[in-house]
Amino acid sequence: MLQNMKCVLGLFMLCLLACTENKYAGIPEKYHALLDQALVKAGDNATELTAALKNAPDNQKEGMAFLIAYMPERDLKELTADFLLENTAYAYQAREKYVWAREIPDTVFLNDVLPYVSLNETREGWRKEFYERFGKYVQHCKTIFEAIDSVNRNVRDEVLVDYNTKREKPDQSPFESMRQHMASCTGLSILLTDAFRAVGIPSRVAGTPNWHDERGNHNWTEVWADGNWYFTEFYFPGQLNNAWFFADAGKAVKNDQQKAIYASSFKPTGTYFPLVWDENIRYVPAANVTDFYTDLYKSHLETISADGNHVPLRIMMFTDNACVQNSEDRVAANLDIFCGDSVLYGVPASDPDS
């Protein structure tokens, strides 16, 4: 009797194991438990997600599993199989077509090319259209840097969107911005990030909830190339790591949640991207990348200090024209230094390091 019970139990375990393996056939085991949890959270929409996993081609199954395993709960309950299958298909198509995309590590591709979203924007099927729109700008590019340059230089004229405070909302999706022909810095950054991703260039949105001198938030775009991240913006500054906000970013405060700099992630990181338009949203993962900007800016200052073409400048603001040089008569004021229309520096005059 005992021997028979052991046989029955053994057969049951084998059947259970077979069912589990068949359920996630072709998907790495590291995703299985995560997918189980995701499908429970999905509720009635689990059938759509299961269909997406089942119908994804073998070479795209890990990508589909990655998206479903790590997507926020709102997406688990709403996204359709067709939406996910199209997004994944065109992401892998770009990876197969472009030489730089084929060289991207899997971890970078999954987290910074494959995702259909950057922040909390409306979920849209932008990838197919953007693959076609921006493919023409990179078809003759031989390196990822050439491709980045080409997309960045042409994105504005391709989508006909400009910065405008009259836009409907700050966190617009690509098509919402294109319909209005206007967007916030966040909307522009999402547009550019999606344009890069559509042609196999890893990209993410970066930004700060508040500049070091209390001037408010700003968001921009980062791109990955040859093992490193670089920053740029919708209005191409001419070269990477050289946008108008560089000086401000260089003064960010890592341990101040409101004045640190964050870069978006699809996979959870233990940190969230602070969204100033809805501070209750905590489901957008992020990395605190403040050190990258402050270290880069420090190196930049050391370089220009040694080149013989720059001189130190000290500016103080006073309460009246008596200009008494003591701390009681100094006042705090924001200081912006321009060269034409470009902001070279932006610091508070009361900053002891300015």
Regions found by a protein language model. Give the residues of each.
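Bacterial N-terminal signal peptides that target proteins for export
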Residues: 1-9
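Hydrophobic helical h-region of N-terminal Sec-dependent signal peptides
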Residues: 10-14
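C-terminal motif of bacterial Sec signal peptides marking the signal peptidase cleavage site
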Residues: 17-18
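Non-catalytic protein-protein interaction scaffold segments in large eukaryotic complex-forming proteins
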Residues: 23-60
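Secondary-structure boundary elements
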Residues: 50-51, 56-180, 269
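Loop/turn elements at helix/coil->beta-strand transitions in domains of secreted/extracellular proteins
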Residues: 144-147, 198-204, 226-228
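Cysteine-centered nucleophilic/redox motifs
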Residues: 151, 181-206, 221
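His-Asp-centered catalytic microenvironments across diverse enzyme cores
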Residues: 164-166, 198, 209-214, 219, ...
